[in-house]
């Protein structure tokens, strides 16, 4: 039995998430609440921790306070055993500047790699919804002998132009890596599907260090992992693709096997929530064998009084539904829905309040939003357009702390 390799986890969590505005007006994209009890970063951290990768650096930058606080309060590991999940903002070790890209974030944090001296480094994104056992991908990488392994998910070729696409040969060696091509390549075994990059990579340590240092010296580079580092290694013949559909997560069902969602737009974020409240959701939050860990607040249970009800909904701890109707919605913790109010097809984040006889439909309410008595959101889009953001799909998004 071979010795387990020494693996360091690096999570790229500096994303601004402009397409999710106003949800990212006051927080980094990985800190956006999701699913009634989580933040987006909880999915990647859960995957790494479940795989027993317990030395993790989270590289942060944009409006990172809520993200830093969430990690420090909810992701404490045993320091006695050398385990840690630590947020790392730009240290400005190489001069008075912030990160200029995801590759530059690693370049400015090379001291963390030198200190840990790992055999391999997993570099994962922080803002996707999925389950994955990264240990299987690391084993695949070691067996392949490649310098970098790129996780790829199969999508219909007709839908692949919105993503970074992978062209691989029959052996899995990546021949080309192209961002948003007009003509996406097929996979070796299926010309109707395309491997799309998940933004998850496994590197042999020396290969990553050499590529990062060379990129830092390139004045023409954008210093981006997907846009610069991976194409550089592809050109050198050092990159292979890992087929995400081969990843077997304990407790997974046929429906949620290889589930992965980029929730970087309001519509994608909303649709992923609506899946959660369906009778048979594609993504199962209740897989106890591969749990997603989230907020650990000590809150009272949700309460329904005076005939209040919730149907096909997720309702977070500490919430109170009083003589109100909630349908097809996700309510986070400490949400109050008052007498006579109606909430339908909506995503309500922690601490929000929907007043007496108010109506909220097809909407996303950020933290601590207050909808006053008799007010309506998502009913008159022309009126809402004057006050709030509205997605291409007609979802009304109300920013943090707004009183209506």
Swiss-Prot record:
CDD domains: ADP_Glucose_PP (cd02508), LbH_G1P_AT_C (cd04651). Keywords: ATP-binding, Carbohydrate metabolism, Glycogen biosynthesis, Glycogen metabolism, Nucleotide-binding, Nucleotidyltransferase, Transferase. SUPFAM superfamilies: Nucleotide-diphospho-sugar transferases, Trimeric LpxA-like enzymes. One of its GO terms (biological process) is glycogen biosynthetic process. It comes from the Bacteria. The keyword ATP-binding applies. Pathway: Capsule biogenesis; capsule polysaccharide biosynthesis; Glycan biosynthesis; glycogen biosynthesis. One of its GO terms (molecular function) is glucose-1-phosphate adenylyltransferase activity. Its EC number is 2.7.7.27. It catalyses: alpha-D-glucose 1-phosphate + ATP + H(+) = ADP-alpha-D-glucose + diphosphate. Alpha-D-glucose 1-phosphate binds at residues 99, 164, 179-180, 197. Gene3D superfamilies: Hexapeptide repeat proteins, Spore Coat Polysaccharide Biosynthesis Protein SpsA, Chain A. The keyword ATP-binding applies. Involved in the biosynthesis of ADP-glucose, a building block, required in the biosynthesis of maltose-1-phosphate (M1P) and in the elongation reactions to produce linear alpha-1,4-glucans. Catalyzes the reaction between ATP and alpha-D-glucose 1-phosphate (G1P) to produce pyrophosphate and ADP-Glc. Belongs to the bacterial/plant glucose-1-phosphate adenylyltransferase family. This is Glucose-1-phosphate adenylyltransferase. It comes from Mycobacterium ulcerans (strain Agy99).
């Amino acid at each position: 039995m071979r010795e387990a390799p020494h693996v360091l986890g690096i999570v790229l969590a500096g994303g601004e998430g402009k397409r999710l505005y106003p949800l990212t007006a006051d927080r980094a994209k990985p800190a956006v609440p999701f699913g009634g009890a989580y933040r987006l970063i909880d999915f990647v951290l859960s995957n790494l921790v479940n795989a027993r990768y317990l030395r993790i650096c989270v590289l942060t930058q944009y409006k990172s306070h809520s993200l830093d606080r969430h990690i420090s309060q909810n992701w404490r590991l045993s320091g006695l055993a050398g385990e840690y999940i630590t947020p790392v903002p730009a240290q400005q070790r190489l001069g008075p500047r912030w990160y200029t890209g995801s590759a530059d974030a690693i370049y400015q944090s090379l001291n963390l790699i030198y200190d840990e001296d790992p055999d391999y480094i997993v570099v994962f994104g922080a803002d996707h919804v999925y389950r994955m056992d990264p240990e299987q991908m690391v084993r695949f990488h070691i067996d392949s002998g490649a310098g970098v392994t790129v996780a790829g998910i199969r999508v219909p070729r007709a839908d692949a132009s919105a993503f970074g696409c992978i062209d691989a040969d029959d052996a899995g060696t990546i021949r080309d890596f192209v961002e948003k091509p007009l003509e996406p390549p097929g996979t070796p075994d299926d010309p109707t599907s395309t491997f799309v990059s998940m933004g998850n990579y496994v590197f042999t340590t020396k290969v990553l260090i050499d590529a990062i240092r060379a990129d830092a010296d390139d004045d023409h580079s954008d210093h981006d992992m997907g846009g610069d580092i991976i194409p550089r290694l592809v050109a050198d013949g050092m990159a292979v693709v890992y087929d995400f559909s081969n990843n077997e997560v304990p407790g997974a069902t046929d429906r949620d096997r290889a589930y992965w969602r980029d929730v970087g737009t309001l519509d994608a974020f909303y649709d992923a929530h609506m899946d959660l409240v369906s009778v048979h959701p594609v993504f199962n939050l209740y897989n106890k064998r591969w749990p997603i860990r989230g907020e650990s607040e000590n809150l009272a249970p949700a309460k329904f009084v005076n005939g209040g009800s919730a149907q096909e909904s997720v309702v977070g701890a500490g919430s109170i539904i009083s003589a109100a109707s909630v349908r097809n919605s996700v309510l986070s913790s400490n949400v109050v829905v008052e007498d006579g109010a109606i909430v339908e097809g909506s995503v309500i984040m922690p601490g929000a309040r929907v007043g007496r006889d108010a109506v909220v439909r097809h909407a996303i309410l950020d933290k601590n939003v207050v909808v006053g008595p008799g007010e309506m959101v998502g009913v008159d889009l022309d009126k809402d357009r004057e006050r709030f953001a509205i997605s291409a799909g007609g979802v009304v998004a109300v920013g943090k702390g707004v009183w209506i």
